[in-house]
């Protein structure tokens, strides 16, 4: 699934947004579950992916599309937490803070840490294609947070052209497109502004 920004506010609610600002009301229950997993939280903005996993722990887009299992949120970036804006920090520093931040979460939570691999991009991509995953994202580890389509962007999405679950992806996003996008040039900008 395309990246979803997650806004957790006062540990009472969590809202997910598509990167273009459209809210994902389809995942309201996931947001509540995540908010409950962070009882001592003030505010946070996480960037990550909403996925459903099969028995082997692999993402299954069709399960997400047809709500066949409970989704979870894999956080791969921390943009804002407990009053601090991390977007200008290096990715590697944000990952350290994210791991520290998620240490508060119980192991059975639907909020999970998405780890990274350094220096083995080609081998990782070959493995991803072999097990039929969507692709990988390559990021500059010392770069600041830069949303896609922005001059500050320091990452590249590399897609598996033979990914078997590509069909139907837009259908999931269209469910919530009838709603107006949240004002702001980018969902993470809005989320960080609301959290501050």
Predicted regions mapped to residue ranges:
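Catalytic cores of nucleic-acid ligases and guanylyltransferases
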Residues: 1-196
């Amino acid at each position: 699934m395309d990246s979803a920004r997650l806004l957790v506010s006062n540990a009472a609610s969590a809202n997910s947004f598509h990167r273009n600002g459209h809210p994902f009301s389809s995942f309201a229950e996931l947001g509540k579950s995540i908010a409950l997993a962070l009882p001592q939280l003030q505010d946070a903005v996480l960037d990550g992916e909403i996925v459903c996993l099969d028995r082997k722990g692999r993402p299954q887009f069709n399960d997400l599309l047809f709500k066949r299992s409970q989704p979870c949120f894999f956080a791969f970036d921390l943009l804002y937490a407990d009053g601090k804006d991390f977007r200008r920090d290096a990715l590697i520093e944000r990952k350290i803070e994210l791991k520290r931040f998620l240490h508060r979460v119980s192991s059975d939570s639907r909020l999970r840490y998405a780890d990274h691999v350094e220096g083995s991009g080609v081998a990782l991509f070959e493995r991803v294609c072999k097990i039929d995953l969507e692709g990988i994202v390559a990021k500059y580890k010392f770069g600041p947070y830069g949303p896609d389509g922005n001059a500050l962007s320091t990452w590249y999405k590399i897609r598996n052209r033979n990914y078997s679950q590509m069909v139907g992806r837009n259908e999931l996003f269209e469910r919530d497109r009838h709603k107006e996008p949240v004002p702001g040039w980018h969902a993470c900008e809005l989320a960080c502004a609301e959290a501050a």
